């Protein structure tokens, strides 16, 4: 059975203030035991605190994050050995790429070249006992020549598995449950965040009154929000059950924007909903 955990990107500010160990202690007190690390500097000091949390608190490091270009995570091209060493230090068996560089995503040729590089990296990581994964957003559901970018990634880099983010699947115009079914056996990691429709802002009314149709459409489309699990429109029992059926190992709560709420309060809301649905045994 998979473990429900937390994507630590949403706690990066707290880590910057209090350090990884204290944040991980608060997470375990809040009823979580697994994490995925992203956008947190993997300095020797931070890795040492994470390892301490593993040893003393029993934290399970489900996955670490990396990139193949500039960004907040270590680059697999330039720091391969360090990333492998971090995985060994934390007993992490999965490394995930949050997104390919936008310069690669811009063209079919760029996607193919990205896949060529990541396929080589996936093979090298596999030799070290680590599995590489690609995390989707909505843009990977763009169709080129009748094929989505995500399917092209699978075809061109078969050694790289998938991390399915159900919010971004929905935003990409696909059904999360059917997408998890489609990629069953290829998905070890799933991101849990809701797809919430917020209120129209005052800018929409102002644009309508002024006759600025372009501004109105921008405001009209900007109501999609990143919700706590259970606070939006996704069917969570179906999503979690299909994640289990598809072979996922970690289901990771994430929220890209908190809209002024405290991160731990957001996590508590998501956790409570999953417990109410009967998934406490996965925590």
Predicted regions located by residue number:
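Conserved beta-strand positions in the central sheet of alpha/beta enzyme cores
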Residues: 36, 63, 96, 133, ...
């Amino acid at each position: 059975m998979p473990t429900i955990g937390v994507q630590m990107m949403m706690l990066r500010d707290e880590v910057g203030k209090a350090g990884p160990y204290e944040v991980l202690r608060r997470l375990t007190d809040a009823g979580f035991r697994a994490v995925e690390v992203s956008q947190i500097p993997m300095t020797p000091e931070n890795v040492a605190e994470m390892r301490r949390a593993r040893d003393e608190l029993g934290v399970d490091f489900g996955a670490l994050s990396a990139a193949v270009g500039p960004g907040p995570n270590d680059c697999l091209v330039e720091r391969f050995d360090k990333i492998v060493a971090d995985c060994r230090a934390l007993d992490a068996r999965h490394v995930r790429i949050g997104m390919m560089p936008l310069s690669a995503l811009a063209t079919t040729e760029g996607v193919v070249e990205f896949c060529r590089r990541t396929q080589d990296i996936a093979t090298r990581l596999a030799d070290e006992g680590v599995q590489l994964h690609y995390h989707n957003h909505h843009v990977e559901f763009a169709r080129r020549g009748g094929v989505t970018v995500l399917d092209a990634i699978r075809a061109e880099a078969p050694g790289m598995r998938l991390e399915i983010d159900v919010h971004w699947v929905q935003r990409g115009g696909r059904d999360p449950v059917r997408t998890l079914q489609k990629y069953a056996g290829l998905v070890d990691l799933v991101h849990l965040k809701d797809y919430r429709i917020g209120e129209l802002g005052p800018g929409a009314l102002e644009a309508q009154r002024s006759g600025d149709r372009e501004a109105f459409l921008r405001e009209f489309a900007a109501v999609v929000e990143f919700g706590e699990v259970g606070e939006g429109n996704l069917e969570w029992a179906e999503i979690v059950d299909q994640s289990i059926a598809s072979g996922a190992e970690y289901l990771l709560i994430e929220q890209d924007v908190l809209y002024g709420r405290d991160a731990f309060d957001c996590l508590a809301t998501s956790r409570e909903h999953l417990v109410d649905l009967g998934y406490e045994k996965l925590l």
